[in-house]
Structures are given as C-alpha cells and as structure tokens.
C-alpha cells in the first residue's frame, strides 16, 4: 500500500530505532498478526511508549486516525499519530525546560551557544548531521549575525525544530 505524505513525513521524523521500538509495542497488541490494532488498545500502547494522552485526546486521535471508522489502525497510521503526540508534547515543553537545555549546552556559561556547542546539541539528538547542516542552522538561527545564538534565538530555533 502506498504511503500518504503524512505517513512518509512521520517516518522521516523518527529514527530507525524509534520505529523499531514502536513496532515492537504495536505488535504486542496486534494479536492476530493482521497488521492492525484495535483503537481500544491505543491508549495502552501509547502509554507504554511514554505518551500520556487524556481520554479526550485519545478520542480525538482515534477519530482522526481511524479515517475509515474500522475501529482499527494500522502501523503507518499509528506512526503518524505517535509523531503528532510527540510534537504536541514537545510544544508543551515550557521555556523553563528549554532554559535548562540552553544552560546545559552553553558549556562555557557565557550566555551564548556557539557553533561548536550547536554541533554537540545536534549530535546529542542522535541525528546524523553534516558540518554544512550545522552551519546552515547556525546562520538561520543567529538573527543578529554575531556568530552565536543567544537565548531568544535559541527559543526561536527550537520552535522551528518542532
């Protein structure tokens, strides 16, 4: 079956390891091996994977994901949904957490993140990034072109990432 744009995007957002982890959790509930799980089990699977949707969120998710109203979702639909939850969660991460993040990456505590520090951040996320990508992100994020990222620029950059 061909993937929708959303599904392709969801796959691109996740690392291979995450997809494998999600698949393992998904398969535990795919009792008959038919490649889909009951929407009833969705909450349980999501909680296993560290998500914590409320009943309302869950209903909204199911309504959105189970487009054909079959009462089941397949793995691709599941990925789309997990990515959406993760992005929501990330958005909900307060500035306070980002401030902590900033302090951790601002190794020399000068109130700025320089290109070295930025490279470390990106590599720490497990993303495979080239020097060129790091330079591009630095250029994009460093609005006042002083060669460093201050906290406000960092916040904007993180919004962009999510």
Curated annotation (Swiss-Prot):
Q: Which PANTHER family match?
A: MYOSIN LIGHT CHAIN 1, 3 (PTHR23048), TROPONIN C2, FAST SKELETAL TYPE (PTHR23048:SF57)
* Record: residues binding Ca(2+) 2: 66, 68, 70, 72, 77
Identify the residues that the record assigns to the EF-hand domain, covering every copy: 17-52, 53-88, 93-128, 129-162
Please provide the record's keywords in A-Z order: Calcium, Metal-binding, Muscle protein, Repeat
**Gene encoding it?**
TNNC2
Q: Which residues bind Ca(2+) 1?
A: 30, 32, 36, 41
- List GO terms (cellular component aspect): myosin II complex
Q: What's this protein's family per the entry?
A: Belongs to the troponin C family.
Binding locations of Ca(2+) 4: 142, 144, 146, 148, 153
Q: What's the protein called, per UniProt?
A: Troponin C, skeletal muscle
Organism name? Meleagris gallopavo (Wild turkey)
Protein's job: Troponin is the central regulatory protein of striated muscle contraction. Tn consists of three components: Tn-I which is the inhibitor of actomyosin ATPase, Tn-T which contains the binding site for tropomyosin and Tn-C. The binding of calcium to Tn-C abolishes the inhibitory action of Tn on actin filaments.
